[in-house]
A protein has these predicted regions:
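Conserved recognition-core residues within compact binding domains
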Residues: 1-84, 90-127
Length: 127
């Protein structure tokens, strides 16, 4: 299993090529509280994608899509014209080998080919 620091959160969090996020141990600076290293559990956002809360060094917490963190950590920033696709169509499988960049058109075409009932429902709704 490979791990790398998450871009923008170096020294705070790292992610594996399997899509697992952990925090680093952070010692106390004032003797009051230290933070142990621990696995950060993702949550489902309601559309099937996993998200994760990360807190920066200033204490500000933000939500991030796990598949985007994995891709950008092990590859490069995602261009605005591209989207991440899960090759096996399982939105919770965020292993780096299961992620690929597609255009919006390619991603929608794949979704409709894998889910023909969606297109039929749209046709029935419009007509």
């Amino acid at each position: 299993m490979l791990t790398k620091d998450i871009l923008g959160f170096e020294g705070l969090y790292y992610v594996s090529n399997k899509g697992e996020v952990n925090s680093y141990f952070r010692p106390s600076h004032n003797g009051i509280r230290s933070f142990p290293s621990k696995k950060i559990l993702p949550f489902c956002n309601g559309t099937g994608y996993l998200q994760i809360n990360l807190t920066n060094c200033l204490g500000h917490r933000s939500k991030y899509y796990l598949h985007r963190l994995v891709w950008e950590t092990f590859n490069h920033k995602i261009p605005k014209s591209l989207e991440i696709d899960h090759l096996d169509n399982i939105k919770t499988n965020n292993h780096i080998t299961n992620l690929v960049l597609l255009t919006r058109k390619q991603n929608m075409s794949k979704m409709l080919n894998c889910n023909p009932h969606v297109l039929n429902n749209l046709k029935n709704h419009i007509l």
